[in-house]
């Protein structure tokens, strides 16, 4: 958990409710992203009368622009994955030559065509999400929602008309927004919102950040032929992931032609005739067509009227909730990125589902944040579940066993691509329980999703070893790693500043 929550207890659902009062809605939700839509549908299925509001649709968000489907569908996971697919074909076409495919003519990449296909898809999904709400009997309002009181929401429509609705429960699911660094010339840079909708393909890109968004866009643009410089403050990208796997990702990025600038920050951006001059804190100068800021996200909570109502939030603007997603105001709840617990779409879906189950389904249910799988859709991708080696060493009292496998995928032996797949298991030496798994290589997210089930169920290394593998496949390596790579003493904090 990234932040301290309110003390929890079995929620008293009558608390905060005015006895005998008739409300317009049992539940009113502010924000129709992944979490909001899931909470609306599930609550309605439990018999609740539900209203939900969302800002007008546009691919690029602002304080007054959003869209049903939220960040993931409109300007996040989905369009990004489409671009990752598009970028992957460049390497695939090159690799195809040794498999007998003769590419006699130049293969041109059409950015505008891909962009239009991406836009068509998010428009389609936006429509699907609206239909899901309608089919569930949820009333959708387009406009900006604010909390007027513990049981009242005000919705400002496009024409300025203000609508007011009472609700027994209010759920905040407004998500988060990309941050910008406070440096001279920052207005010349863009965030991931704009990066997904650029009218012209950037031939030269500078990316600030070492997180998954930065790494993914570096892979996307490089895969499409751009010159990419990735600037980040640590020694390795992807802080918080397993250090060994971070090094693998860094090696792969460099192997595909991305220029890495570790322990570096941006000092200034200057507009020139040739593009944008980027000056680093080391005095190095780079020229770019696009500068992408991938420096984190902040909760969308500023315009909700939280202070007036008395809803508690932290310095970053994240709404503080208990283990049932309830705020300090009994009738007001919050899920997803706006709470800054674990900012992933599947986590928001989990929180929303359990909120509905708690409030309207008669079963008080807490989200479980243990053993949640992650994926970084760089090329090739990284996927992990459970504890990293560093986390296991710090949290485990006894020794920790590390099993690794590094190999050249069968496909690469023919294509000639020099890029190893790396897989890793972290095991508690005393209990034999598999604490974590990592993989960097083709299809890693698809493979690790299956491994996540085993780890969630508490599988041991012996059970992994007794499982018959699928041959030939990369996945079978997870059940054939017999010899430990190293044994590490647990209960100590690893010395790492990577």
Swiss-Prot record:
Its main location: cytoplasm. The active site is a redox-active disulfide bond. InterPro entries: FAD/NAD-bd_sf, FAD/NAD-binding_dom, FAD/NAD-linked_Rdtase_dimer_sf, GSHR, GSHR/TRXR-like, Pyr_nuc-diS_OxRdtase, Pyr_nucl-diS_OxRdtase_dimer, Pyr_OxRdtase_I_AS. Induction: Increased expression in the recovery (post-stress) phases of both drought and chilling. It holds the Pfam family Pyr_redox_2. It is an enzyme of class 1 (oxidoreductase). Its cofactor is FAD. Its EC number is 1.8.1.7. Signal peptide: none annotated. Binds 1 FAD per subunit. One of its GO terms (molecular function) is glutathione-disulfide reductase (NADPH) activity. Homodimer. GO terms for biological process: cell redox homeostasis; cellular response to oxidative stress; glutathione metabolic process. Belongs to the class-I pyridine nucleotide-disulfide oxidoreductase family. Disulfide bonds join 72-77. NADP(+) binds at residues 210, 213, 216, 233, 239, 296, 375. It is found in: Cytoplasm. Glutathione binds at residues 34, 129. This is Glutathione reductase, cytosolic.
């Amino acid at each position: 958990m990234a932040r301290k929550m309110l003390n929890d207890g079995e929620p008293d659902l009558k608390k905060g409710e005015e006895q005998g009062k008739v409300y317009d809605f049992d539940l009113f939700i502010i924000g129709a992203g992944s979490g909001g839509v899931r909470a609306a549908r599930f609550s309605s299925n439990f018999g609740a009368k539900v209203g939900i509001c969302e800002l007008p649709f546009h691919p690029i968000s602002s304080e007054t622009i959003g869209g049903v489907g939220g960040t993931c569908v409109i300007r996040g996971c989905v369009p990004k994955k489409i671009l990752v697919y598009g970028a992957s074909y460049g390497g695939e076409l090159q690799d195809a030559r040794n498999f007998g495919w003769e590419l006699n003519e130049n293969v041109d990449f059409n950015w505008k065509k891909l962009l239009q296909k991406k836009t068509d898809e998010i428009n389609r999904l936006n429509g699907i999400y609206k239909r899901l709400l309608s089919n569930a009997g949820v009333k959708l309002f387009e406009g900006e929602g604010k909390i007027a009181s513990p049981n009242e929401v005000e919705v400002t429509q496009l024409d300025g008309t203000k609508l007011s609705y009472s609700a027994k429960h209010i759920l905040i699911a407004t998500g988060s927004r990309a941050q910008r660094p406070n440096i001279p010339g920052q207005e010349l840079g863009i965030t991931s919102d704009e990066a997904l909708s650029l009218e012209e393909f950037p031939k030269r890109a500078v990316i600030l950040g070492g997180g998954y968004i930065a790494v993914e866009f570096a892979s996307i643009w490089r895969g499409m032929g751009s010159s990419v410089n990735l600037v980040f403050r640590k020694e390795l990208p992807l802080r918080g992931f397993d250090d060994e796997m971070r090094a693998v990702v860094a090696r792969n990025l460099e192997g595909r032609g991305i220029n890495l600038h570790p322990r570096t920050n941006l000092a200034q951006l200057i507009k020139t005739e040739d593009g944008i001059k980027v000056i680093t804190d080391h005095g190095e100068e780079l020229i770019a067509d696009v500068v992408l800021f991938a420096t984190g996200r902040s909760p969308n909570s500023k315009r909700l009227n939280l202070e007036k109502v008395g809803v508690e939030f932290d310095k970053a603007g994240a709404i503080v909730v208990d283990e049932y997603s309830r705020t300090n105001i009994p009738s007001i709840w919050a899920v997803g990125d706006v709470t800054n617990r674990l900012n992933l779409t599947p986590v928001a879906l989990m929180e929303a589902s359990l909120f509905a189950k708690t409030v309207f389904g008669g079963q008080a249910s807490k989200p479980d944040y243990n053993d949640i799988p992650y994926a970084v859709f760089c090329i090739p991708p990284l996927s992990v579940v459970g504890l990293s080696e560093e986390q296991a060493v710090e949290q485990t009292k006894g020794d920790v066993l590390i099993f690794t496998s590094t190999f050249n995928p069968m496909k690469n032996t023919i294509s000639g691509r020099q890029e190893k797949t790396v897989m890793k298991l972290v095991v508690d030496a005393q209990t034999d329980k598999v604490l974590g798994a990592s993989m960097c290589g083709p299809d890693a997210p698809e493979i690790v999703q299956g491994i996540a089930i085993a780890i969630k169920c508490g599988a041991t290394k012996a059970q992994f070893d007794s499982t018959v593998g699928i041959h030939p496949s990369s996945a079978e390596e997870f059940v054939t790693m017999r010899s430990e790579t190293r044994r590490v003493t647990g209960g100590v904090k690893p010395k790492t500043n990577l």
